[in-house]
Amino acid sequence: MTRIRRGYIARRRRTKIRLFASSFRGAHSRLTRTIIQQKIRALVSAHRDRDRQKRNFRRLWVTRINAVIRESTVSYSYSRLINNLYKRQLLLNRKILAQIAILNRNCLYMISNDILK
């Protein structure tokens, strides 16, 4: 059986991995084995954090809506607002409500007052 010289294929594979890890620090961008490990770790973190990002943004929107709603009336909260929105079948998601709360508070106050009636 003849010896297979796989220099070009292996070099191409390694350079592709090196390009991915070129911005990493220290041995993580120089040594092939650690580059491979760090690439796997980076991709796992990216996959995990895409789900976390959705969670974090939803928490941010809820916090913003709650802060603005509590300023308007004494005994009104986020949970009551969302409950009343569902009762009235108004299709406003949390992202849109948070944008309204930041950009135009009076509009959110009008929405909440109309729902209460």
UniProtKB/Swiss-Prot annotation:
Cellular component GO terms, alphabetical: chloroplast; ribonucleoprotein complex; ribosome
Chief location bin: plastid
SUPFAM superfamilies linked to this entry: Ribosomal protein L20
Record keyword RNA-binding present: yes
Molecular function terms from GO: rRNA binding; structural constituent of ribosome
Places the protein is found: Plastid, Chloroplast
PROSITE patterns in the cross-refs: RIBOSOMAL_L20 (PS00937)
InterPro entries hit by this protein: Ribosomal_bL20, RIBOSOMAL_L20_CS, Ribosomal_protein_bL20_C
UniProt entry keywords in alphabetical sequence: Chloroplast, Plastid, Ribonucleoprotein, Ribosomal protein, RNA-binding, rRNA-binding
Keyword Ribonucleoprotein attached: yes
PANTHER family: 39S RIBOSOMAL PROTEIN L20 (PTHR10986)
Name this protein carries in UniProt: Large ribosomal subunit protein bL20c
Lineage: Eukaryota, Viridiplantae, Streptophyta, Embryophyta, Tracheophyta
Designated gene of the protein: rpl20
